[in-house]
Regions:
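Flexible, D/E/H-enriched segments
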Residues: 1-33, 51-167, 175, 195-272
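Short, glycine/charge-rich beta-strand/loop segments that flank catalytic centers
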Residues: 38-46, 118-123
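Short, solvent-exposed loop/turn segments at secondary-structure junctions
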Residues: 43-45, 152, 191-192
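A contiguous pocket-lining binding segment that forms or flanks enzyme active sites
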Residues: 168-174, 182-196
Length: 272
């Protein structure tokens, strides 16, 4: 493990990650989508007393956090929230027509979907959905429909349910009476904040081979081995939606950051 934490190894991973991001940007630009549906996890934007397993943001626009270019402060999370620097935000376009169609289409297909019409004062969607803007061409005004999938227990869908969801999501998108070109993206995952390379390898194998049966059997206990690992379900959902097209792996980088094995199984891939 010490070798994984060496400066040279970290720099090597950094170079690999930048190269993977460049390839993703090329793929997104080539796809030339008119609207993007992003499957990810809502962080801190559902009311504390109301949490949904599945949800769709259907507002005309929503606030998204953006980098403030301030030096990284590792102690910020331990301070009183009132004394922390406020993240910068910018408004991004949604697509209510597609969002409403997805809600009704999924309900028709057996999925009860919550809808979110906007954010409370001071709230903003974070990098879970904001990452897509790093991939879209600079200056793009492509609208985004956030599809929110809970990663939290006990209101967390099973892997099998997410496979069924992905299939229904595809049908709903295909039934939309529009000439607009719809893109679909999974954001988040794979294993983190403790890396599980065995699980990640199984997931990547399922994504690249199109083995939805195996992805549907991913153990709930293993998926919850670390707080962020359930975000794998985002990928399972999109893989099912994209079937029979399999994912092409761009890169998998286990980015370790401590001797305890903490870190992030960073994964990049494309469908199409």
């Amino acid at each position: 493990m010490e070798a994984e934490l060496a400066l040279e190894k970290r720099q090597e991973r950094g170079v690999a990650l930048l190269a993977a991001l460049a390839k993703l940007r090329e793929s997104v630009a080539a796809a030339n989508v008119d609207v993007m549906v992003v499957v990810s996890n809502a962080h801190r934007i559902w009311p504390d007393d109301s949490q949904a397993v599945f949800g769709v943001m259907r507002s005309e626009a929503f606030a998204v956090t953006v980098p403030n270019n301030e030096p990284f402060d590792p102690d910020a999370r331990f301070r009183d929230p009132g004394t922390r620097a406020k993240p910068q935000t910018t408004d991004k376009a949604g697509h209510p027509d597609l969002a409403n169609h997805l809600i009704s289409g999924l309900i028709e297909r057996g999925f009860d979907v919550a809808c979110k019409d906007g954010l409370r004062e001071g709230e903003a969607i974070d990098e879970a959905f904001g990452f897509v803007y790093d991939l879209l061409p600079e200056g793009s005004t492509t609208p985004v429909v956030p599809f929110m999938l809970s990663r939290y227990l006990p209101y967390q869908a099973s892997a099998a349910r997410c496979v069924a969801l992905g299939k229904a999501l595809r049908e709903a998108i295909e039934s939309w009476d529009s000439s607009l070109r719809v893109g679909l993206m999974a954001s988040g995952g794979l294993s983190h904040q403790v890396i599980d390379e065995e699980l990640d390898a199984r997931v990547v194998a399922g994504l690249t081979s199109g083995d939805l049966a195996d992805l549907a059997e991913l153990p709930r206990e293993q998926l919850n081995g670390a707080p962020g690992t359930p975000e794998i379900l985002n990928w399972v959902t999109v893989a099912a939606a994209m079937a029979p097209t399999n994912m092409t792996l761009v890169d998998y980088v286990p980015a370790f950051r401590s001797l305890a094995g903490t870190g992030h199984g960073l994964t990049y891939g494309t469908w199409g």
